Amino acid sequence: GYFNPIHIGHVDYIKNASKLGDRLVVIVNNDRQVELKGSTPFMSEYDRMSIVSAIKGVHRAVLSIDADRSVVRTLGSIYDEYSVDYFFDSMVFANGGDVNSVNSREDWYCESRGIKAVYNIGGGKMQSSSSLLKASEKKRYDPYSMYEF
């Protein structure tokens, strides 16, 4: 995920995704991907990784190595790393409430490797990073918005 900025919906998604398997590896989109999405990084990719890593239930956070908006190369890297483990028997690619399957590159990769793709983890969109950023912008330009009269 982008986690730009991270919010309660992300935490709920991570909590629910952690129930799908023994280990939860979270892919954090890199700063270039944030820009490709049409946004500006609210925090650096390393800050976002540190925060995600600290959330209960996260076994490991991985920074996306992809140069486009997909995470298919990163997903492949994780699969290659874990699938050689003697105890590995399956993998799930989980997405939050704001992502739906639309024959993405990730879907194709998952199907080719027998990875189960699950969407709408954590229910519908509870909060949006973009709405938080817009609210933050309003407060930045209105010095009195933080005071009640």
Regions found by a protein language model. Give the residues of each.
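Nucleotidyltransferase catalytic core that binds NTPs
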Residues: 1-149
